[in-house]
C-alpha cells in the first residue's frame, strides 16, 4: 500500500517539522526527505542559515498559491545551497494538494530557493474526473476533491512538504492586497524558519 504522507497531519519518524514565522502568523509544515532529499536538504539548510529571514512572499494569487523564498523579491533571484540550479524530485507519493509546500521553477531542473504554498481551495469537478482517468491514485483524487489543490502542477513542481498547522495564516497571506505582478502592497515577511528535527 502506497503511503501518501500528505493525507495525515502526524509527523512521522522520517519527516522533519519546520515552523515558518511570518508577520501574518505562523505556519507549521512537515517535510519529506525520503521523497525529495535534495530539495528538503536545500530548504532546511537555508532555513537554519537564516537565508529566508526577512524574505517576502513576492507573488500572491488568492485561490491559487503564495510564493516566496527569493531574497531579491523579484521572482528572478534566489540560489540553492548547491551553487547552481538542481534537479526536480518528482514522486508518485506527493502532490500539489491544498497546503502543499512546492518548489517554484523556471522549467525542468531549475530549482533554487523559491517555493510556493498551494492555496487553491477547490478543484473543478470536470478536472477531478480527468485526474481519475489520467492515472492519479484514488486517495489523491479524493483529497483533491475534499481539500482542493493544483493538480496540473503535479510532476512539474517538486512537492517536498505539507502544511499541518496555520491554515488561517496561509489564508491571511493569500487575501493580502496585491499590486502589479501579484506583489503584495504591504510586505508579507518571513521572519524566520525554525527546524525541529
From Swiss-Prot:
Q: What domain of life does the UniProt record list for this protein's source? A: Bacteria
Q: Which GO terms describe its biological process?
A: protein folding
The protein's enzyme class: isomerase
Q: Where is the PPIase cyclophilin-type domain?
A: 14-195
Q: What is the reaction catalyzed? A: [protein]-peptidylproline (omega=180) = [protein]-peptidylproline (omega=0)
Q: What family is reported?
A: Belongs to the cyclophilin-type PPIase family.
> Which PANTHER family does this chain map to?
PEPTIDYL-PROLYL CIS-TRANS ISOMERASE-RELATED, PEPTIDYLPROLYL ISOMERASE DOMAIN AND WD REPEAT-CONTAINING PROTEIN 1
Q: What is this protein called?
A: Putative peptidyl-prolyl cis-trans isomerase
Source organism of the structure: Staphylococcus epidermidis (strain ATCC 35984 / DSM 28319 / BCRC 17069 / CCUG 31568 / BM 3577 / RP62A)
